Amino acid sequence: VKGYDMPVLMNAFGSYERMALALGVEKLDDVGDELREIMKLPYISLQHKMDVVSLIPMAKKAINFPKYVKKAPCQEVVEMEPDLDKIPILTCWPQDGGPFITLPLVFTKNPATGKRNVGMYRLQKYDKRTTGMHWHIHKNGADNFRDTKAAGGEKIEAAVAIGADPVLTYAATAPLPRDIDEMVFAGFLRHKSVEMV
């Protein structure tokens, strides 16, 4: 983008081949096949005489909790006076009201439970210091905001990540049940824990 020293990636998920590449699989069906395999795991009670040890390899593939680290690449540049004008934020659609950050990972948490949500909510740039969040009323991030307000808060604590691993983008947009953590799902897709700070 003219006038910026930061590259822009567009249409990263624009074909089946690009989606497979982003998810690290040969074919997109591989992801579904693996999920179906995990869903077939039997329920195990303490009274069940089944060989539990045989299930450990599959369980290790299925559950990769986030790994917390002290230092990460996202901490290498710290802007004390953030300026959105330094970032190439584009107006992509003819009817958009202005430039939007289109695929940000928006991290919020529920004030009562502390449960994390990672959603994909477009951010409209209003000026060099301000954005507006576009989330649908039925999304978990919106629930967290309503719960924050109900608890007496005026603002919700949020973090935004731009340019992350495409698996995180995919996980944040996946129609997961409310109790499934997007970062755990991303770990499942990547077959390793996602590093977080």
What are these language model-derived features?
Residues 1-197:
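Extended, highly charged
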